[in-house]
Each structure stands twice: as structure tokens, then as C-alpha cells.
Amino acid sequence: QWDLEIDTCLRAKRWVFEEALPHLKTSGNGVVINISSIAGIVGRTGPAGQFFNEGYAAANRGISLLTETWARIGAPEVRVNELMLGFVESRHGRGTRGWGLLSGDQKQALIDHTLMARTGTIADVVKAVLFMLKDAPFMTGTVLRLDGGYVLGGDRVAAMPPGVL
């Protein structure tokens, strides 16, 4: 499993980037968006631990390093950024095989741990990608985390007691 995760998450991206880079540089306005997972931050902890193995987590952490390195290599003709996904439709969220294997309590634990109290939608991902492509011409080497606040956890900020500054 470890080798499969490294091959599909890191090696495949590198091969595509190396082949595409000359063409992207020639265009003068190339954009690369690396898709990654919050597994690179949370690993096997909390409610997400039932989805992510160590190889997947390590590979996704590595994507962030590739994003920063490739941003340096591509600049100024090519912008390279990363969209780090949490639990979204078609990727660990509702409607996926993994989601279907969870008990109701496990699903609720994931939702409760997410500040936005839901999984993401494909429309959420599309909006983020369009922003990165069209509306962020000065952004490169950046990780945009689209996780509904999962990494922050479900803890809310308590009100301060009266008289405390």
C-alpha cells in the first residue's frame, strides 16, 4: 500500500509536471494546481484516522513540498499552488465507498469535527479551482485548504466570563 500511495500521489504528479513544464513556461501564463488531502496534516488522528493510512498521509505531506519547489522552478511564467481537500463528495465524503462503510456514529463524528458541520461538495471544489485559476494571479507556492474547518476541529470558542478582558 505504501508504494502505491507514493506512486500515485507523488511520482505521477512529478512525471506530469516535468513533461508539462516546458509547455507551461512557453505559454507565459501557466497554472498548476496540485490536489492533496488533509491526510498530510492530520495523518491517522481523530475521526479521519479511519480513512488515511500512513503512506497516504506521507505522500500528501510530500505534495506540499513539491508545490513550494515547483513554484520556485516555474516562476515567473508558471504559478503552482495546492488545493488541499478535506472530506468532499467523490473524495472520502458522502457518496464514496469509504463513506458507505462507516457507521452512523462514525459519520457523525466526522461532521461534528468539521466547523462547517457538513462535507464539501463538488461545487465547493470547482469554485476553489476557478479562484486559483482566474482570480489569484499573484498567488504561487500556496496551499489553499478546503476542509470546512476539519483541521481546526469541532471545538468552538467559549464566551469570556463577565469581567474578564
Summary of predicted features, one role per range:
Residues P47-G49, F87-H113, G153-L165:
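A glycine/serine/threonine-rich, flexible loop-to-helix segment
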Residues F17-E18, E68:
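A short, exposed helix-loop element centered on a Lys and neighboring polar residues
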Residues R118-L146, V151:
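C-terminal substrate-recognition "lid" of short-chain dehydrogenase/reductases
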